[in-house]
């Protein structure tokens, strides 16, 4: 598949390998520019992606280029433009949110990372276009969340060597952390949690690392995950790099490994946010873009309808409230998304401002609802982490089932002291 440009390659010395790799991938047109001319080139012809093929010792020129990218984003309604930066000796480039790649790796891998980042740009463009289209039909257009994606990102740290505690600590200063001491634990976390990056620490042999990389390579949804491998597994990285474009070996301290991975983690979390936003737009705002559950006003409207339908048909209906008193924003959002995955297709839910989650079980009596709610609470306790990194988020569950004399207000009043007011 050809890469539709233009693409800007910034370097004071000719970057023939990068240009040739881009041409081999079908990229067109390719604009080469020196650092002194980079800002003017971007202004004249805004690129789809930027490759910093060599470093820039002049911080003023780098700042001018960064400002030019900000201006381009403003003109394009904030559209994301990927910047891939070659870093000498694995040093982090002094360029905000640049996706670093070691200068010594083949240029084909650089193009692979650019292609992965362009998928996020395409998704972002689709979301912005759909928002403009929806705005012509209704005034109730949901806003794209603008918080830092790192605030809701989660990283899997797998390993059982001496570096594992320091990696978890370093990652926990920036993002949510899920620890795994075995490849089975890592695979379980991948299936049950929202993961935006993986760090494979020391303590694993080559076969274990290969097994974990195979799990990632075999599923399309994992292939763009940023993966940092700590340890000397060069041969494995080279063999999996064609199918895992964001796979890289990192050395140095735990803080250095996390610093390298953070721009990739932020980008992956942003991509997940865009997918939730697209689902929200598909549902014309009925789905909350943060949680993936129903928007609050829609939930209470649907609850009223479900109560009326159940009363007319004589069908069972139950409601549960999951309260998470110790949860911060990140934990609360992840819990809501996890509940969304655990629910049956006939059920619906929303999250309130206090992070509590209301879930309606249609055609379900109190006994059956108790079984389902207990299973959800058990998964939350086993899977979720508290803010201090300890497993087991405290989850209080209250249940009620519809009685013949019930209204929506009386049903909800039995599970909460002060029922939320529908918007």
Model regions and ranges:
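Amphipathic HAMP/coiled-coil signal-transducing linker helices
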Residues: 276-298
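Two-component/phosphorelay signaling modules centered on CheY-like receiver
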Residues: 9-31, 160-183
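Active-site-flanking beta-strand signature of metal-NTP-handling nucleotidyl enzymes
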Residues: 154-155, 293, 315-326, 349, ...
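Catalytic-core segments of nucleotide cyclases and related cyclic-nucleotide turnover enzymes
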Residues: 366-377, 400-423
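Receiver (REC) domain switch/output surface
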Residues: 97, 106-130, 137-138, 243, ...
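Conserved helix-loop-beta segment at the catalytic/binding core of cyclic-nucleotide signaling proteins
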Residues: 286, 335-369, 378, 382-390
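Conserved phosphotransfer microenvironments
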Residues: 34-39, 48-79, 83-89, 196-236
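Short regulatory alpha-helical coupling segments
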Residues: 294-315, 334-344
